[in-house]
A protein has these predicted regions:
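Conserved beta-strand in the GNAT
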Residues: 59, 65-74, 83, 88
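Short amphipathic alpha-helix that is part of the acyltransferase structural core
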Residues: 1-45
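Conserved GNAT acetyl-CoA-binding A-motif
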Residues: 110-121
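A short helix-loop-beta-strand connector motif used in the catalytic cores of GNAT acetyltransferases and
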Residues: 47-59, 83
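Conserved acetyl-CoA-binding loop of GNAT-fold acetyltransferases
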Residues: 129-139
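Active-site beta-strand termini and strand-to-loop segments that position acidic
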Residues: 61-63, 147-148
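Conserved acetyl-CoA pyrophosphate-binding loop and the N-cap/start of the following alpha-helix
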Residues: 92-105
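A short acidic/small-residue loop/turn micro-motif
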Residues: 74-76, 143
Length: 150
């Protein structure tokens, strides 16, 4: 998933959380974001491992440093849809394309015209709308991406 001249690498998270995860979690908590802490708790409890059909969890490394993480799970409320989850990009790595590359890579793995939802934090609404999600505040999410129009 890496271009030869691109210092940003995306790697699937399969068996263990990535090296550097504790620093990522500390940054998220310092900003008041709990999604990375929830990811760690769910991972340890084995309740969410991003291993069902259509699911994935990707880590983003820039020059070897864990810059961000993001996943896609089955949407529990909207039939047939998937949900972007546990997205976080460290402050030092924002606005340089890390989040966009995570989203693009996850969407590339989606089969068919499945809709994708996200429950966007207020600070991330502009980002999610910039990658094609539209406001749709219902069923526990804030935005939806209709793959039919992509």
């Amino acid at each position: 998933m890496k271009a030869s001249d691109d210092p940003l690498e995306l790697e699937p998270v399969l068996d263990t959380l990535p090296v550097g995860f504790d620093a990522l979690r500390a940054d998220a908590l310092a900003e008041g974001f709990r999604q990375v802490e929830r990811l760690a708790a769910d991972w340890e409890a084995r309740t969410t491992r991003f291993d069902r059909d259509g699911e994935a969890l990707l880590a983003a490394r820039l020059n070897g440093v864990l810059a961000g993480i993001g996943g896609l799970t089955v949407e529990p409320v909207v039939p047939g849809a998937l949900r972007m989850r546990r997205f976080y990009v460290r402050p030092a790595f924002r606005r340089i394309g890390v989040g966009r590359k995570l989203v693009t890579a996850l969407l590339a793995g989606v089969d068919g015209d499945r809709s994708i939802t996200v429950n966007a934090a207020p600070a991330s609404i502009t980002f999610w709308e910039s990658v094609g999600f539209n406001p749709d505040p219902r069923d526990g999410h804030t935005h939806i991406l209709s793959r039919e129009s992509v």
